[in-house]
């Protein structure tokens, strides 16, 4: 999309950019009370926009047990036992990565019972699509064994592994223990983690009732009432299929992480071919094609932008089919419907997406985590390895890509993600650093209908700016991930200045 003019100085007044220039023209504005900030030759950029962020969950998880780096059941068990010894009434843990575990599988409830059997233990996988409970937790949360996604053994007893509808139900039950005051306290404490990475706007993917039925969600209701209180622009995607609820709230967006399929890690992302390491398995879609068509039709009638969480190419087929069906009655291009992730999009699907005006919200960090030779993508996809996250071909088809971290799946830093897009493990899928930067600036604004307000440094736009710690023109591609943010400005106010702590 657009690349703004290069300039040497920017004048801010209140919450807007009012003047750009080169040379010493800024001197005419040097008056008492004007603060000057010298970037000292470092690069100044628009504030970063993260288009796929789970704000409330990320904030709450700061107090959970982090299983990052636990590569054996033994290491996992040690961390959980420490949490039990601290006297936690409920042990909540996240970032359990089955791909990194030596055992290459999730623990069972019986194995968790051996670690802790006198209180609920709740483990969330790194891809946030699988939950593992001990026996105490299964009883504590009163999980119905008949729910879709409950893992059962040969005796029809629960294994402790929950996916799909069952996992969504569990998320709802866990969040019931948190009050609005808990949400606020966690959010206030967490926001500096975004500011120090230069993020000034997020698309907040909130709620977990899209697989469990209609009705209000406590996370979403909290943000509807309180988002404007924070020094961060929060654009809410209400993760539900209840169109009437979202329309009545006066919101413009629905879905986000609206699961159309599962993930590669759990062999549940919906494919048109078998998994390389599990012949005969192709994953599955959560919704029928008929339901998808009627849902999209209702959203279009109510003017709602939709975010579809679709990873495998069969799931992407379902989304594009529903959009093509809606396009028979109306022009869907101006609605900028989105596919989140779209990791295995085919060439013919790129052509359809471009024709329908679909925006792809993608996560370059996935390639750094799973895309390397011998990594999870290659294990699951075999011959199709190399077809994931094809940023170059997608852009060449005229599709807008915006970027998101999907935190806590990937780390927050947009610069790390930008590095991943530029240094894709499959070189032909890489893009230029300018294209990668646009994923988190002007393209990010476009994906949220905010391109007239932010996303570039231009007169009249929001005074959302960041100063990096160096000149990007002097940074090699291999060093992009090392670039830090020195200063973050939101609506003309400094909200972050770097210290050694960040």
Show which residues each predicted segment covers.
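His/Asp/Glu-enriched, well-ordered alpha-helical/loop segment
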Residues: 297-307, 314-316, 320-337, 341-342, ...
